[in-house]
C-alpha cells in the first residue's frame, strides 16, 4: 500500500482532488513539534517543582541536558530555601550545657548571635519556672540561642542566693544580666514579663506593645486611689 504522506506526483493529484487531506507544511510540523516539546518541558518542570532534593537526585538520569538545566535551577532554589528555613529554625529549644561547654557555646557562639544563659539549680521553684518560660520563648525566637546550666558547673561556689541568674550575650560579650529572685519579681513572673525584660536587652524582638508588668509606681498609685475611694464611701455611709 502506498504511503499517503509520501511526496509523490500521484499523492499530489489525490490531494488536489480532495481524496487525500492536505499535507502539512514542514514549518507547521516543526512548530507542532516545538509546542509539544514546550508542553513536555513545562510538565517536567512542574513535576520537579513538587519534588524534594532527594527525589531530584534520584531522577537526575531520566532527562536530557536541557531538562537537567531546568532541574538544576530548581534544585538550587530549593537548596537556598532549605538553608533559609534551617537558619531561621536554628535552635528552638533550651540547650543544657556544663562549664566545659561554655567557651564553645557562648564565647564562640557565632557572629551576630544572641545567647541567653540561665544559671539555675534543681529544687529552686523560681529557677524551674524560668526554665519553663524559656522553653516557650526558645520556640518563639528560634534564631536566639537559649541555654541553661547548673550554676556551680559554670561558676564554682556561685551562691544560691543569686539564683536564678540570666546573662545575655552578643558575640561573647555580656549585654545584660539579671541576678536574684527580686529582679524577676518572684513566683508571679509570667512568660510575657520575662519576654519583655529580655527584649529590653536587645536579644529578642518582642511583639508585645507594652510592658505587661505595671511599674511599682502605678501599682502604688492605684492602691492609694482605691483606699481613698473606700474611705470616702465609708464617710458617706457614716453621714
Swiss-Prot record:
The superkingdom listed in its UniProt entry is Eukaryota
Q: Where is the Phosducin domain?
A: 32-180
Q: Which PANTHER family match?
A: PHOSDUCIN-LIKE PROTEIN 3, VIRAL IAP-ASSOCIATED FACTOR HOMOLOG
For biological process, the GO terms are: angiogenesis; apoptotic process; positive regulation of gene expression
Write out the function statement from the record. Answer: Acts as a chaperone for the angiogenic VEGF receptor KDR/VEGFR2, increasing its abundance by inhibiting its ubiquitination and degradation. Inhibits the folding activity of the chaperonin-containing T-complex (CCT) which leads to inhibition of cytoskeletal actin folding. Acts as a chaperone during heat shock alongside HSP90 and HSP40/70 chaperone complexes. Modulates the activation of caspases during apoptosis.
Q: What name has this protein been given in UniProt?
A: Phosducin-like protein 3
Region span, Thioredoxin fold: 91-239
Q: Name one GO cellular component term.
A: endoplasmic reticulum
Q: Which UniProt keywords apply?
A: Acetylation, Angiogenesis, Apoptosis, Chaperone, Cytoplasm, Endoplasmic reticulum, Host-virus interaction, Phosphoprotein
Subunit record text? Interacts (via thioredoxin fold region) with KDR/VEGFR2 (via juxtamembrane domain). Forms ternary complexes with the chaperonin CCT complex and actin substrate, leading to inhibition of actin folding. Interacts with XIAP (via BIR 3 and RING domain). Interacts with HSP90AA1 and HSP90AB1.
Question: InterPro entries under this entry?
Answer: Phosducin-like_chap/apop_reg, Phosducin_thioredoxin-like_dom, Thioredoxin-like_sf
Changes after translation: N-terminal methionine acetylation destabilizes the protein.
Residue numbers of N-acetylmethionine PTMs? 1
User: Which residues in this protein are found as Phosphoserine?
Assistant: 43, 234, 236
This entry's Gene Ontology molecular function terms read: protein folding chaperone; vascular endothelial growth factor receptor 2 binding
| Compartments reported by the entry | Cytoplasm; Cytoplasm, Perinuclear region; Endoplasmic reticulum
* Family indicated by similarity: Belongs to the phosducin family.
